[in-house]
Regions:
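Active-site cofactor/cluster-binding pocket
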Residues: 1-191
Length: 191
């Protein structure tokens, strides 16, 4: 079984970091993993997208991803770009209200988490991406939350290691929000 998750936003929202974190967590769980990211020339504010493919078996390299199983959208700019790859029943974790519900995604499982607002309320304004990732993981079980937390030390560069506890709290807050709202997907990623 193979699952493709596309994460989209703008530069400065941590899209490449959260994709790398999910990929690392998947490897720690014994999955085959491939990640590829694309971003604009601007460091902050340009488009940023990354797709992580996780599988039980070998991944054909490079993978052609005609459909995505889940989307994490932090900014409305990227939603239109990923729309052609959306399959029926896609899981959409979106940073609400910044990212409105897409009109043409019929049957999508919509997890509208106020990630930016939650991050600000925690005193972690840069933690919205981690909150959304925690929500995605709780809603889909694509990887375990504990695997994400364990992967933080391997993914964060040395000068960011001091932020491990804050990132862990953001991941846990996103997962807790999904549990509180009862917005978990009906089927887990690997069932």
């Amino acid at each position: 079984m193979e699952r493709a998750v596309t994460m989209t936003g703008i530069g400065g929202q941590g899209i490449q970091l959260i994709a790398k974190l999910m990929a690392e967590a998947g490897m720690r769980e014994g999955r085959q993993v491939m990640m590829f990211g694309m971003f604009g020339g601007m460091i902050r504010g340009g488009s940023s997208e990354s797709t992580v493919v996780l599988a039980d078996d070998e991944i054909v390299s490079p993978p052609i991803v005609p459909e995505v199983w889940a989307v994490l959208a932090m900014h409305p700019e990227g939603v239109a770009k990923v729309t052609p790859k959306v399959r029926p029943g896609v899981v959409l974790v979106r940073n609400a209200p910044m990212v409105p519900p897409p009109r043409d995604w019929s049957g999508a499982k919509d997890v509208a988490i106020p990630a930016t607002d939650l991050a600000k309320s925690m005193g972690q304004p840069l933690g919205a991406g981690m909150i959304a990732l925690g929500a995605l993981v709780e809603a889909t079980r694509i990887v375990g939350l504990s695997s994400l937390v364990d992967a933080l030390t391997g993914v964060l560069p040395p000068h960011r290691q001091k932020h491990i506890a804050a990132n862990r709290e953001c991941l846990e807050r996103g997962a807790a929000w999904v549990r509180e709202q009862g917005t978990a997907a009906e089927t887990a990623a690997w069932s």
